[in-house]
Amino acid sequence: MTTDELTKSLEAFTHFTRAEWAQLNDGHSAPLTEKERKNLEGIYETISEAEVNDVYMPLSELLYKRMVHNVRLHDDLNRFLKRERKRVPFVIGIAGSVAVGKSTTARLIQALASRWPGSPKVELVTTDGFLYPNEVLEKRGLMKRKGFPESYDIRSLLTFLTDLKAGTPVVKAPMYSHLTYNIEKDHIQTLIEPDVVIVEGINVLQVNRKGKRMPHVFVSDFFDFSIYVDAEEKDILSWYIERFQLLRNTAFQKPESYFHRYRDLTDEEAVAMAESIWHTINGVNLEKNIKPTRLRADLILTKGAHHRVEQVQLRK
């Protein structure tokens, strides 16, 4: 995309500074205690009360208004069509790079949405569960392409979303273990008539144009609202290295960890390994497959160097 094309695309968004966005919060304090915020934090990022009040409270209110609009439209159409069609879940998609903090954003939105009027049932699903199992990736020579579009069972993900939006009472999703770096064969996430479903993953806004047999429908077609969590690559790389070092001292120490072989790396070796993985896999995926999708989002959250959201862009 040229600079002119990018500028034109960004004109489709209303831009808010953090201060401007924070003003949309009409004096409401976050309904989360300090302990609850701590439980929602990632392993290397904190969630301040100011971050919740300034950024996520207005976002939560916006999402609630969008959901209420959908409900009213559904009821109006039922009256017009003289049908009693079942109400289906409000689906929110959250995309962004590895290590950008999208999982924390997803958990925060889940916590706030569950406190909306009526206490809706809110489920969070990650697309990691729709990665092909390691044995399949190894057979296809794709282990070093894990996270790239071809490493996902997109058909299964689309089937899951189709069932969800068809109002199927019970929908199941596979689960993924970041410890074993593989699908958990003995665990399934079961969603029973949820009101809101958050689908989080690096690939949720991607448009797969490769392969004649791929369906002409995309994951994002099922979203009622989509969010892209953005940041400068140098900052994301810094966070990735920090996360790698923390995991080296914690999860990697466990014998069952896929990355157990990295447990004894020195600080210098850990940094070098994290940088190598980034520049050969995650950084390449970000540049080619993830970042180009941000302009497909309804809202972009742009973070600064300290995980603090500095700018919000909302599609007009």
From Swiss-Prot:
Q: What is its EC number?
A: 2.7.1.33
GO MF, one term, reads: pantothenate kinase activity
Report the pathway entry: Cofactor biosynthesis; coenzyme A biosynthesis; CoA from (R)-pantothenate: step 1/5
Domain of life of the native organism: Bacteria
Which reaction(s) does the protein catalyse, per the Swiss-Prot or TrEMBL entry?
(R)-pantothenate + ATP = (R)-4'-phosphopantothenate + ADP + H(+)
Cite the InterPro entries for this sequence. Answer: P-loop_NTPase (IPR027417), PanK (IPR004566), PRK/URK (IPR006083)
Q: Where are the transmembrane segments?
A: none
Q: Where in the cell is it found?
A: Cytoplasm
Q: What residues bind ATP, as annotated?
A: G96, S97, V98, A99, V100, G101, K102, S103
Q: Which family does it belong to?
A: Belongs to the prokaryotic pantothenate kinase family.
Q: What is this protein called?
A: Pantothenate kinase
